[in-house]
Amino acid sequence: MDMNQNRQRQAKQGLYRPAYEHDACGVGLVVNVGGGKSHEIVENGLQVLEHMAHRGAEGADSKTGDGAGMMVQIPHEFILLQGIPVPEKGKYGVGVLFLPKDQAACAACLDLAASVIGREGLDLLAVRDVPVNSEILSDEARCSEPAIKQLFITGSEDQAALDTELYIAGKKIGRAAREAGMACYIASLSTRTMVYKGLLTSHQLRCYFPDLVNPYFTSGMALVHSRFSTNTLDRKSVV
């Protein structure tokens, strides 16, 4: 099932009514109150998430989750180690995009995003393929697995102004994608934070995203989410 088909499933069907959606998720936060960044914060966040497995739903196969994710501060040093030519902290933003696995459709979405970014007076420095371990997914989860890309963007020298520019660009990318019938979902777009998430169980997040267990991947905070959809349907925007 591709992302467009998944979105179409959210419409009223059978006894399901989108207007009555509720969920019962688990949320946890690990933070260094002094502001210092370390990989320990990320590791502790993963442990908190795993200890909240009872707050997230999963299928009978124990491999299909309602969703799990983590928001972290942008790991500047880790990004430099990936060979991405970003400027100093606060002078660039990172967008996390979920795109179709089909190469042509994915390329079309990236072209659309790059076009909007350029029209907004921003510069797209680089696009990174986020490494994932698809082998841990169930067959059901693998059918809706997106291609996950990180976009590195520069603009105004002032961080607050750049965040505003990124917000506007993100909204325009989303609108243009919807009008074109493209399956392009922005998980995060900011100069400060980035998101790693998916239709995973709480225990799958660290295994699915190798970045999160890299000792050079650091943050001063880790906000985690374990989703229990209750009477909702699964979709990436609510993970």
Predicted segments, located by residue:
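Extreme N-terminus nucleophile/cap motif
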Residues: 2-9, 14-65, 159, 166-190, ...
